[in-house]
């Protein structure tokens, strides 16, 4: 077997992108392995850093969501449905609605009460989201 055939075989079966066997054994022993070892270590280090950053972002997002939820809960307690009933009585009577129909909707209509509660929750969650944005800017 001539040297070219042997070189081709080694290149085909080599895992490195260049022919390692052409490097002197002394160089391979001292520098080559330490270079690849440090490169592998750097690759693991970079991967670990990326994963740590990903987890940090995840925990920040969880903390933000928890802060928003707590703020929304507090706001929801301060915004009961009877305040909306009073608002509707004050303003809708001027536009043809009777006090009795408004009171019946707020007191007796379960579907209306459920949808009103959903709407109030949506309002306070949106306001809480914007409040956390404003607080984080400062």
Curated annotation (Swiss-Prot):
GO terms for molecular function: deoxyribonuclease inhibitor activity. GO terms for biological process: symbiont-mediated evasion of DNA end degradation by host; symbiont-mediated suppression of host innate immune response. Keywords: DNA end degradation evasion by virus, Host-virus interaction, Inhibition of host innate immune response by virus, Viral immunoevasion. Pfam families: Gam (PF06064). It comes from the Viruses. Gene3D superfamilies: Host-nuclease inhibitor protein Gam. The keyword Mitochondrion does not apply. 2 forms, GamL and GamS are isolated from overproducing cells; the shorter form (GamS) is more abundant. As both have good ribosome-binding sites they may be independently translated. GamS is processed at the N-terminus and starts on Tyr-44 and Ile-46; both start sites are present in equal amounts. In cells with an induced lambda prophage a protein consistent with the size of GamL was isolated. Both GamL and GamS bind to host RecBCD nuclease and inhibit its activities, protecting the viral DNA against RecBCD mediated degradation. Isoform GamS mimics DNA, preventing RecBCD from binding DNA. Expression of this protein in E.coli renders cells more sensitive to fluoroquinolone antibiotics (which inhibit topoisomerases and induce dsDNA breaks). Frameshift mutations that delete most of this protein (starting from position 78 or 97 of GamL) allow the bacteriophage to overcome the retron Ec48 bacteriophage defense system. Homodimer. Interacts with host RecBCD without displacing any of the subunits; this interaction prevents RecBCD from binding to DNA. The GamS isoform makes extensive contacts with RecB, and inserts deeply into the RecBCD complex. This is Host-nuclease inhibitor protein gam. The gene is gam.
């Amino acid at each position: 077997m001539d040297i070219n055939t042997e070189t081709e075989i080694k290149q085909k079966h080599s895992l490195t992108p260049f022919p390692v066997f052409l490097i002197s054994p002394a160089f391979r022993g001292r520098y080559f392995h330490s270079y690849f070892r440090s490169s592998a270590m750097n690759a693991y280090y970079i991967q670990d850093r990326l994963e740590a950053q990903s987890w940090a972002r995840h925990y920040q997002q969880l903390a933000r969501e928890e802060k928003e939820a707590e703020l929304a809960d507090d706001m929801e307690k301060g915004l009961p449905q009877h305040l909306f009933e009073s608002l509707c009585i004050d303003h809708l009577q001027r536009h043809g609605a009777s006090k009795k129909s408004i009171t019946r909707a707020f007191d007796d209509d379960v579907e209306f009460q459920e949808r009103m509660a959903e709407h109030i929750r949506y309002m306070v969650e949106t306001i809480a989201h914007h409040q956390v944005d404003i607080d984080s800017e400062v």
